[in-house]
Design a protein with these regions (language model features):
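Minor-groove-contacting beta-hairpin "wing" of winged helix-turn-helix DNA-binding domains
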Residues: 235-240
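Short amphipathic alpha-helical interaction segments
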Residues: 206-224
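A short, conserved structural fragment
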Residues: 224-234
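An alpha-helix initiation/capping motif
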Residues: 86, 177, 214, 241-244
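Short, amphipathic alpha-helical interaction segments positioned at domain boundaries
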Residues: 241-262
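C-terminal scaffold of the Radical SAM
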Residues: 1-210
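Intrinsically disordered or highly flexible coil/loop and linker segments, enriched in small
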Residues: 192-193, 229, 260
């Protein structure tokens, strides 16, 4: 399988270098069980030799009901500790930075002029279309997922041909995201989010507007002091690499604030 992946990367590099494709991306998963620090570094450096214009680096997410989750519960599989995972992620950032890649979102790196437009649309809270089995679209703010099972997806497509189109294809009334989700999405981007700008959508009276802003600042004060979070005017963004690697701490405090004011 690894050999097939390398052949695919080599083909994509050749097509890109010849100008037949404009860009391509490679997805990698770090902090895997049974994968040590050196093994991951070797894989990452190997990937860089193919010069992919765009790289997405994800951490393994263990879901309930999966084989991995069962093995972990049985003590037969062990994930890296939080300290090991942080060290790995920090090393990943430095290797990619020294190889000419810039980080424009927590999980995404690219060479100049190769930011993913789809990723930027998603993290900016704008709408997008996706097509095919199991795909998720959000053209007007609300997410719609197509059936994941082939049989059910075929039935869904047939209904579109024989009856009226599904409302997810025709409803053009935009559904705005909740404020906490909008802040969370914005903070994932390198440029962060203008808090007072996204506050405006709440139509709060001035006194409530300023009160809620002050309460959020209180929650974030310790992260501003520690350097995980940076403020420039009303714009807040996560520092690199520590803020982005430890973003959950900042986001959890923001969700706590949101629950308290609602």
């Amino acid at each position: 399988m690894k050999e097939d992946a390398e052949k695919s990367c080599l083909w994509l590099k050749r097509e890109y270098d010849s100008g037949l494709i404009k860009s391509w991306s490679l997805d990698l998963i770090q902090n895997l069980p049974l994968s040590g620090f050196k093994e991951w570094q070797d894989d990452l450096k190997k990937a860089i030799t193919f010069s992919p214009p765009h790289l997405s680096i994800y951490d393994l997410n263990i879901e309930n009901g999966t084989v991995f989750k069962k093995l972990i519960n049985l003590g037969k599989l062990k994930l890296p500790s939080d300290e090991e995972a942080f060290s790995n992620s920090e090393s990943t950032h430095l290797i990619l930075k020294n190889s000419g890649y810039s980080r424009y979102e927590i999980s995404n790196y690219c060479l100049p002029r190769h930011q993913s437009r789809h990723n930027r649309v998603y993290w900016s809270g704008l709408g997008w279309w996706s097509f095919g089995q199991g795909s998720t679209s959000s053209p007007w703010g609300e997410k719609f997922t197509r059936p994941r099972v082939s049989k059910e997806y075929k039935k869904w497509v047939t209904r579109q041909d024989e009856f009226n189109l599904d409302s997810s294809l025709t409803n053009k009334e935009f559904v705005y995201k909740e404020l906490d989700e909008k802040i969370m999405l914005g903070l994932r981007l390198k440029e962060g989010v203008d808090i007072k700008e996204v506050f405006k959508e709440q139509n709060w009276e001035n006194k409530k507007f300023e009160s809620n802003f002050s309460k959020l600042l209180e929650e974030w004060e310790r992260f501003l002091r520690s350097g995980l979070l940076v403020r420039k005017g009303n714009r807040f963004f996560l520092s690199e690499p520590n803020g982005m690697e430890l973003s959950n701490q900042v986001l959890v405090s923001m969700f706590k604030w949101w629950d308290e004011i609602n």
